Amino acid sequence: MKEHGLEAYRPKTVLFDMDGVLYDSMKFHAIAWNKAMAKYGIDMPEIEGYMYEGMRGVETIAIKCREQLGREISEDEAMEMYLEKSRIFHSMTKATIMPGVKELQRFMLSREMQITVVTGSGQPPLLAGLARDFEGLIDADKIVSAKDVKQGKPAPDPYLLGMERMGSKPEETIVVENAPLGVQAGRAAGCFVIGVNTGPLPDSQLKDNGAHIVFHDMFEVKDALERFLDSQNEKTLD
């Protein structure tokens, strides 16, 4: 963080993405997108599930229909397709919690940071599970989901709303993201963005879309953040 000119940085709020950050779930989403879109005559390779991750589902569907069917679709049509994708996703094995993320959050709380989640998902079962799985770690009442914003990632709106709910300013806020569109959204909102590359995309996809720094798991994030904050404390004592 020092190399980004943040010698005096004092983060107060951390906004986590959900899929691919809190849960090791992206492989299931990618498969579900591929299978669901194929039913409607749309080719969506699994890798695109990672590229579009973070965007509201109906927006992803509208883009793919425009590209491959050559027409605009109604909100009802998009929702029908999204519900099919959700049905396939929920028929799969339940995604596990990302290794190291709870340890990272406990550390953040010990350093007086507040935490919530900003996700492009709007599925009630996932949001309910999120509040349950991370009870005591995240501020569940302030979660931002797809239903809370008109423009999803890569627009800054979800993260701007997250900061508003947490009473935080951009210069006090860290965004933790795994997806290019989410990284774009965090940067557009003015936050310091940590990219955690937990999927098959090259690191450059996160760096080129604006991640200030890229790690490969939550243990790396915790170690780096702890070193940085400890160095800050040493300066204060000096």
Model-based region annotation:
Residues M1-K12, D76, K102, R106, ...:
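Asp-based, Mg2+/Mn2+-dependent phosphohydrolase catalytic module
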Residues K2-M18, L22-R111:
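N-terminal helical cap/lid subdomain that shapes the substrate entry/recognition surface
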Residues V21, T119-S121:
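Conserved phosphate-coupling serine/threonine residues in phosphotransfer and NTP-handling enzymes
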